A protein has these predicted regions:
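N-terminal secretory signal peptides that target proteins for export/translocation
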Residues: 1-9
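Sec-dependent signal peptide cleavage junction
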Residues: 24-40
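Bacterial N-terminal signal peptides
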Residues: 15-25
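Intrinsically disordered, low-complexity proline-rich segments enriched in Ser/Thr
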Residues: 22, 57-58, 164
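Ser/Thr/Gly/Pro-rich low-complexity, disordered linker/stalk segments of secreted
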Residues: 35-82
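Short, surface-exposed linear motifs at loops/turns and structural transition points
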Residues: 76, 80-377
Length: 377
């Protein structure tokens, strides 16, 4: 099933492949730019909090040091001297919403300033800081803790996250942990079955993301095959309105958040508005069109990008509307698995599509597990 108009090969590349090269979350001039993931620290209110994990007392199978007894990093001229900043690592938790977010829980001395921060460093040299003032204040193990969030892409579940406090210009000791460590902890200990199912499906999704993006494929988060049969026929997209032919195509963004990019043709001089709603009749959010500097059939091609889609809502069929002076030109009902249904059909005749198909199958399983976990409370 083709989700684009019949057009020349370069134009098909724009609509079909532009973002299936699955950008770094953001917006085809920019494929190279889109493949550099940006890590942010904003957490959605729709996140599902996954249970607490204590710092492991020993991890001989990974050879990792006990995070409660951090090991100072080797010093070189570019590395600041390690100081005693007074914090104590208490444990971890994970939130799964629009992103994968792991929290480092620490107790801090009472005189820790609000501009002190936890600094996170990933293997790709991404460095972020979260100030005490911006972190969550939580109770854990009967103690008042500060929970610092660190977001990672699905392909980064096996990446070492190095965390250290920065207080008054001084750098504390380094704590090293991975999201995979956390998920394995859940699977190996006494946690509800729904939490274990969610942990297992997230590991499989992370492994399929690594294979699709060609990222650290020698150390996969999960190696099992997804259970989903990719039966997505009910997700075929629907369009209505007076000018449905002005719908040009769609592409899918999977990193670092899930979004759908829709392309529309707009006549010269026309002032069109675009909106997004999770369902018809629900409150709408205005979308800002972006000029692709491409023309087709004498019209300009623009795209709009949906808001980030949480993992547990990946089976939704949101509505994007193109209007002019209040008239419905094109009302498009299209979800993640609308795109998945097209990939399934392509994979039947083109094996190169199988990594993407398997990634979407794993997402299907993860969505189901996240919904079950949410219902279980």
């Amino acid at each position: 099933m083709n989700h684009t108009k019949q057009k020349s090969w370069p134009q098909r590349l724009l609509a079909l492949l532009a973002a299936v090269v699955l950008c770094a979350a953001l917006p085809a001039a920019a494929l190279a730019e889109e493949n550099t993931a940006s890590i942010q620290t904003q957490v959605s209110e729709t996140d599902e909090d996954i249970p607490w994990a204590d710092p492991p007392q020993s991890t001989p199978e990974t050879g990792r040091p006990d995070p409660a007894v951090p090991t100072p990093p080797p010093q070189d001229p570019a590395t600041p001297e390690t100081a005693q900043t007074g914090e104590h690592l208490e444990g971890y938790s994970l939130s799964l919403g629009e992103t994968v977010t792991i929290y480092f829980y620490v107790t801090l001395p009472e005189d820790t300033p609000q501009d002190a921060a936890m600094q996170f460093t990933l293997p790709d040299s991404t460095v972020t800081q979260v100030a005490v003032a911006d972190a969550k204040q939580m109770e854990a193990n009967g103690k008042s803790c500060t929970a610092f969030p660190c977001q990672v892409a699905a392909k980064q579940l096996t990446d070492d996250i190095e965390a250290r406090m920065v207080v008054n210009g001084k750098y504390g000791p380094v704590y090293t942990y991975t999201v995979k460590d956390y998920l394995n902890y859940l699977l190996e200990h006494d946690y509800p079955q729904q939490a274990k199912e969610l942990a297992g499906t997230l590991l499989v999704y992370g492994g399929k993301a690594q294979l699709y993006f060609g990222y650290r494929t020698d150390a996969l988060a999960g190696t099992a095959e997804p259970n989903s049969t990719a039966n997505w026929g009910s997700y075929q997209f629907e369009s209505s309105g007076t000018q449905t032919d002005d719908y040009y195509g769609s592409s899918l963004l999977l990193e670092p958040v899930i979004q759908i990019r829709h392309y529309f043709m707009v006549p010269d001089g026309a002032e069109c508005t675009f909106t997004f709603a999770w369902n018809a009749g629900e409150p709408e959010t205005e979308l800002q069109p972006v000029d692709t500097n491409t023309r087709f059939n004498g019209k300009k091609v623009y795209y709009v990008v949906t808001p980030a889609i949480a993992f547990r809502r990946a089976d939704a069929m949101p509505v994007v509307a193109m209007r002019q002076n209040g008239a419905d030109l094109c009302i498009l009902r299209y979800g993640v698995f609308s795109y998945g249904d097209m990939v399934r059909a392509l994979a039947a005749v083109d094996e190169s599509q199988l990594p993407l198909l398997n990634l979407l199958r794993a997402l299907d399983d993860l969505t189901t597990a996240a919904q079950r976990y949410s219902v279980a409370g």
